[in-house]
From Swiss-Prot:
Protein name per its UniProtKB record: GTPase Der
Name of the gene encoding the protein in the UniProt record: der
Binding site residues for GTP 1: 10-17, 57-61, 120-123
MF (Gene Ontology): ATP hydrolysis activity; GTP binding; ribosome binding
Organism: Clostridium botulinum (strain Loch Maree / Type A3)
PROSITE patterns in the cross-refs: G_ENGA (PS51712)
Amino acid sequence: MGKPIVAIVGRPNVGKSTLFNKLAGKRIAIVQDTPGVTRDRIYAEAEWLNYKFTMIDTGGIEPESEDIIVSQMRRQAQIAIEMANVIIFLVDGKEGLAPADEEVAQMLRKSKKPVVLVVNKIDKLKDENNAYEFYNLGIGDPVTISSSQALGLGDMLDRVVEYFKDDESDGEDDERINIAFIGKPNVGKSSLINKLLGEERLIVSDIPGTTRDSIDSYVDTEFGEFTLIDTAGLRRKSKVKEEIERYSVIRTYASIERADVCILMIDAIEGISEQDQKIIGYAHDINKAILVIVNKWDLVEKDDKTMDKFKKELKVNLSFMPYAKYLFISAKTGQRVVKVLQTAKECYDNYTKRVKTGVLNDVISQAIMMKEPPIVGTKRLKIYYVTQIGTKPPTFIFFVNDPACIHFSYQRYLENQLRENFDFQGTGIKTEFRERKEK
């Protein structure tokens, strides 16, 4: 299961982006924020009271004329409803209750999703009375905040995470491996999934996914039990407005959050695009296992060196994730399709791999003997021992004399030693350095 998703919904100019930017400004323990994955920053990984979650800003749609406000608000709220675990419904305490607020409230009530009503722009104590009229929305007790002054944000987040507690017992079968298929329109995601389901003939069920235009297929194979998530929301018949594409990307992010393994599908004829890099970059940033599949390989004129050359070019474009596995297939002809789930399972096995502490320390001791840590300033790094503290991805803590002595090049050397000895292909690994006083 992925982290809970919290969407901020509201009509234009109520302060959605201001609130999001305040939350993403590391004032509430943001643990990871990845700018540049999309032109506008639309998500941030956050933590409050030990609950980790993904904040999504559904702002950025500012209608040019009044007659399109209602239709754009409906679209914005509907997509948030589909994908979010909890919705922050933001209203303007200075301007007061507006017809557009009432329309959104009606949609949210029908959704049965948890909603936290938040009255923004309550900058002074005397403005608190402005919140009372919002009881008329029928959404519950409002929380008053001032996003510009960072007032009341703690109370708001307390209300949000209360809903996570109610959700803790819910969940999908933990033994199932969730695989998200991502990529440009018409790259062959649905064709590949249909091929996999048709050949395995062991479909347990097809159920509607958590996002519109997305179907989750359950399939049991000799390699394990899988949930195949088709991010068909990116499929478009014609070029659409920027805000629609924005929401297609959000839906893809939601699917990535749920996944254990992300399969990036690339068209062998068109090659990799900037959008491909950004989307798979998000999967990399939040530490998912990754498999890159080049589809339509049957259409490429090739010799015995073509595949290696193509893979080298891909590795240059995806240099930020050198650990990724690669597979060249044709969903149409079935070429190497049988290897897709097998390879995805290999990625997952490495993603969840645990290494015994004794073996781990033997390898690191050998690595230190082969290459001594450099001197940083006047001090040389001493590594006392290392232990693995988690998986998804494999995470290792090195106990050292001074974490400031670790040079990035030596950290990379240690990570490479772990990879060479324990095979972490298909998954990133994390290394942390903590001080341990010498006895």
